[in-house]
A protein has these predicted regions:
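Retroelement reverse transcriptase polymerase core
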Residues: 1-213
């Protein structure tokens, strides 16, 4: 269709907004994630064993994250264990067990939007586009002084995050606050933001094309 070709052509003229490869995470300079503790006492967990059949995949994943600048080697007094989960496609996902860190973290009062109430903003709209940020959390840097608190240990090394990891208290609040700040006055008027998902909505196609591009 003509409109589809026109939109694809316009999107092709702005390659900087798209990830070029799996490790192309991008980075924002508008915020850094802070981890404020009510109890500053460091803690250390022993590394949990990794199944032999998962070792190579975990090693590759750690190397990819390190090369992308998401993690770096650590000498932190804090240490959380990892849990290795296999995705449906066979890739590994590293889940850090941050329960101890989260217990010591002062909770951010910034609330996520109520989905039922927010969806009412979409009433009357007929055109929708959904955008998903590529590894959204990894686009936010961790405050330098707080990086050691994110440290995790496994049989393949001791690492800490340069970018905001999943599983830590307040990460959703940090992300939602950033997204709403970036959208400014168009939030809930032209776009609905929930963490790393954006829904652009409008009543007519002409209006939608303008909002999308």
């Amino acid at each position: 269709a003509e409109w589809k070709e026109r939109i694809e052509q316009k999107l092709g003229a702005m390659p900087e907004v798209f990830a070029l490869h799996d490790s192309d995470f991008g980075r924002t300079d508008k915020v850094k994630h802070q981890i404020m503790l009510s109890d500053q006492t460091p803690f250390k967990h022993r590394p949990r064993p990794i199944r032999p059949q998962d070792l190579d995949a975990v090693r590759r994943h750690l190397q990819e994250l390190s090369e992308a600048g998401v993690i770096q080697e650590s000498e932190s007094p804090f240490s959380s264990p990892i849990v290795v989960v296999r995705k449906k496609n066979g890739d590994v996902r590293l889940c850090i067990d941050y329960r101890k860190l989260n217990l010591q973290t002062i909770k951010d009062a910034y609330a996520l939007p109520n989905l039922e109430e927010t969806f009412s903003a979409l009433t009357g709209s007929k055109w929708f586009s959904v955008l998903d940020l590529k590894s959204g959390y990894y686009q936010i840097e961790v405050e330098e002084a707080d990086k050691p608190k994110t440290a995790f240990v496994c049989p393949l090394g001791f690492w800490e995050f340069n970018r905001m990891p999943q599983g830590i208290t307040n990460a959703p609040s940090t992300f939602q606050r950033l997204m709403e700040k970036c959208m400014g006055d168009i939030n809930l008027k032209e776009v609905f933001v929930f963490l790393d998902d954006l829904i652009i909505f409008s009543e007519t196609f002409e209006e939608h094309e303008t909002r999308l591009l």
